[in-house]
Amino acid sequence: TVARNAAGEDPSDSLVLDGSIGLDLQWVKVDGKLLASSDYLREAESLTIFNLPDQCVVSTEVFIKPHLNTTMMGLYRSRTMYCTQCEAEGFRDITYYLDRPDVMAEFTTTVVGDLQQYPILLSNGNPIDRGIIDGDRHFVTWHDPFKKPAYLFALVAGTLSVVNDSFVTSSGREVHLQIFVEEKDLDKCDHAMLSLKRSMRWDEEVYGREYDLDIFMIVAVDDFNMGAMENKGLNIFNTSAVLVNSKTSTDAAFQRVEAIVAHEYFHNWSGNRVTCRDWFQLSLKEGFTVFRDSQFSSDMNSPTVKRIEDVNILRTHQFAEDGGPMAHSVQPESYMEINNFYTVTIYEKGAEVVGMYHTLLGGENFRKGSDLYFDRHDGQAATVEDFVVAMEDASNRDLSQFRRWYKQSGTPVLTVTSSFDKQAATYTLNFKQYCPDTPGQTGKLPFVIPVRLGLVGAEGEDLVLNSEGHTQVIFEVTEVEQSLVIDNIAVEPVPSLLRGLSAPVKLDYQYSDEQLAHLMAYDTDGFNRWDAAQTLSLTTLQQLAEDSFEGLELTLNGNLIDAFARLLKDESLDPAMVALMLQLPGEALMHQLADTIHPAAIHDARNFVRVALAGALKDNLLDIYNRFNTPIDYRPEADQIGRRSLKNAALGYLMLVGDTGAELAWLQYQQADNMTDKAAALSALVNSPAAADYATQALKTFEQQYRDEALVMNLWLQIQAINSQSGGLSRVEALMEHSAFTMNNPNKVRSLIGGFCSANLVNFHSADGAGYRFLCDQILSLNKTNPQVAARLVTPLTRWKEFAEPHSQLMRSELQKIADEPGLVKDIYEIATKSL
C-alpha cells in the first residue's frame, strides 16, 4: 500500500520504483486492476507507474534467476541454500520497490518451496502460519510487526540443521534463539550462541535495550561478501564470523565471532529500531554500533588489549584512508556507489567520534543521551544531527564545534611541546592542531580534541595534576594553539599524552629514547605503555629504513634491545600486553608514515631489527616460550589467549636464530591441541628459510587433515599468501589452481589474493610490477562476477603517488588499465578514477 506524502512538493501523480536490469516484469496491478503496458514505463533501473490516486495498493510480479546471481547482492544461491543480502541497495534486485532507508514498512512475507529440497524457509519477524501445498511443497508466512526499510529484508531457503536455545529478557519474556548451519558444522555453534546471549544481557544492562521479537535467528552462509548482516530477527552471517571450535579456529577467530555477533545484535536498536534517513547518515548506525561492540568486547576481555587492537586498525588503515585519494568525512556529502562507503572511516573513525562523546560528557550523560536518542527516534529514520542533539540535550552542553568531526575529512595532527620551570615548580604543555588538506577540502577549522593525560615522575610515580588530587585529566584542545600549566611539579616529568588514544589524531611530541623507555616501564596507562614501545620501535625502524635505502650498514641502537630486555623480565605485566609490546610496527603502518615509500628498504629494516632482537634476547625469549608452553585445557578466554599470544610471539622471534626455533615450531605443530598453536607454528615454519623441509611437511599434513574444512583451508591459503620469502607471486598463482581455492567465494579471494596484496608487501611491491599486473587481472576478472569484492581489492593500488619509482608509475599504469576497461562497474570505476 502506498500513499502520497502530503509534505512532498512534487505534484506528479507518477510513482517511481527502484529496480534492476535482472527483473523480468510479468505484470503490474493497481488496486487489483491489471495495467496496460502504456500505464507504466520500465527502464533499466526503475519502474514508473503513471496516474496513481493519492492512496492505492500496487502489486507487481517479477521473475528472477538467483541461481545465476554471482554478485551476492539481492537473492542468490550459496551451496545448498538461497539467501539474501539487501544492504545497501540489494532489494531492488529482488523486486520493484522504493529501495531507500527512509521508506519504512511492515513486512509480511510468505516463502514457498519444495518440502524435500528446501525444508527450512525463513524471513524477518515471527512465523504466523505454515502448511503443506499439494503434498510436496510447503509454505511459511512471517510477519515483522516493526516497520523497516527494504535493506533489512531477509529470506533463506535450504536444507539446514539448527542449534536451539533460549533467553529470558529483563522483563521476563522468553526469546527462542536459533543458529542455522549445514549439518557438518553443528559442532561449531556453541561460542556464537554464548556470545549472543552475553550480548543480549549486556545490552539490557549497559544501554537498557531489550529484544523485541519472539525469535532471533542466525544463518551461516559460506558465500557472503560481508562479515554479517543485521536483518531484523534474521541475521545472515558469513561462516567465518559464526563457526568456531578449538580444533579448527584460532583465538582471533573466537574473538572475531564474539565481536561480530554482538555488533549485529546491537544493530537491533542502533540501526533497526532507529535506522538512518539516507546513506549519508551511514555512520549514525555503524559508528555507534562499532563503539558499542568495542565496549562489549572490552568488558568480556581485556580493555587495554581491545583498545590496542582497535587503534592498530585505525592507525594502519583509517589514517591511510584519510591520507589517500579516497579520503572522506564521517558524514560524506556525495558518492557515486554507496557500497564504496562501507569504509574504515564510516565505521572505525565513526566509532572514535562516538567514543569522544563518552569521554567529553562522561558515562552517565552519555547513557542519558543514548536513552534520549532511542526514545525520541524509535521507529524512525534518523540523522547524525538527531544523535548530536540528543547528546546536547541530555548533557546540557553545546556541541556545535564538535560537529566538525562529522564534516571535515582527514586526520588532525596534534603537535605538543613542553617546558619545565624548576624555580616556579610549573610544567607547561603547549598544544597546536592542524589538519592537512584532503580531496575537496582545504582550510580546516579547529576540532574539539579531548586529550587524556598524566605525568610520570622520575621514580615512575603518577604526579598530582590539580587541587582535586587527580593524577589524570582530560584537557580539551579547541583552538589552533592552547597551553596547559600544571603547578607544584618539583622535578621534570615525562608526559603521558592522549592516553587510550582519547582522540583519533596523530601525536607529534619529540620524546627521547630514554623518555619512551621510562613510559614503557612505568606508565600506569596500559595503552600508552604499549604506545611508547611502538614509538621507540618506529623511530628505530624509520631510521634503519632510510639507511637501508642509502645502502648503509645497518646497526641496532642498544636502547631498543635494553627496553625489550626489561620488558621480557617484567613478570608483573599481563602476558597479552608483553606480546603486543613485542610486536614491531607493521610494514603497512611504516608505508603510511613514510614521505616516500621504498617497500624493499622498509621490509629489510624491519627484518633486520627482528633478527637483531632475536639474537640479543634469545635466552630471554626461550625462557618465555618454555614458561608458557605448558599443557592446558583450551578455553578462548583472556588469560589463556594472553599466554598463547606471548608464547607464539616468542616463537616467531626464535625462528630467526639458529635451529632451536625451527625444532620448537615443528614440535609445537605436531603436538598442538588447538588451532591457535598449530597455525602459529605453521606460519613460523613457512616464513623461515631455515625450516623449509619442516614447512613442506607441515603444509602437506595440514592440508590432508583439514581438506574438508573450508574455513581452515582459507587459513592455509592465507598463511602461504603472506609468506614474505621471495617467490611470493609464483606461490599465489600456483595456489589459485588448488582445489581449495575458487574465485567464486569471497572468503577465499580475501584469504589468498587479498592476503598477498595487502599483507605481503615486499612481494606485492616487487620492482618489476608483476604484483600490480596480477592484481589488475584479478580485479578485472571479478568485475564481471562480483564487483563489490573486486572494488575492495583496488585499495593497494590507490596510493601510488606516495611510492618511489619504479613502483609509482607501474601502479598508476595498472590503475589506468582498470579505469579504461569497457563495461567497468561503477564500484570499481569510482575508486580507480578518484585515485588517478
Where do the language-model regions lie?
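Beta-strand-rich binding/interaction modules
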Residues: I21-V30, D398-Q401, T411-L497, Q542, ...
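Hydrophobic alpha-helical and helix-loop surface patches within well-folded domains
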Residues: D31-K33, E89, W142, S171-Q423, ...
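Short, hydrophobic/aromatic-enriched beta-strand segments in well-ordered soluble domains
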Residues: T1-R4, G19, L52-N69, F107-L115, ...
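Extended, low-hydrophobicity, Ser/Thr/Pro/Gly-biased non-transmembrane segments
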Residues: E61-N164, D525-W530
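Long, ordered, helix-rich scaffold segments
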Residues: T316, D487-L836
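A surface-exposed beta-strand-loop module
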Residues: S12-S14, S20-S78, D134, V477-P493
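Surface-exposed beta-strand/loop patches in extracellular or lumenal glycoproteins
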Residues: A3-L23, Y96-D99, A105-D114, E385, ...
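Long hydrophobic segments that form regular secondary structure
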Residues: F341-D375, Q408-L445, G500-G526, D531-Q542, ...
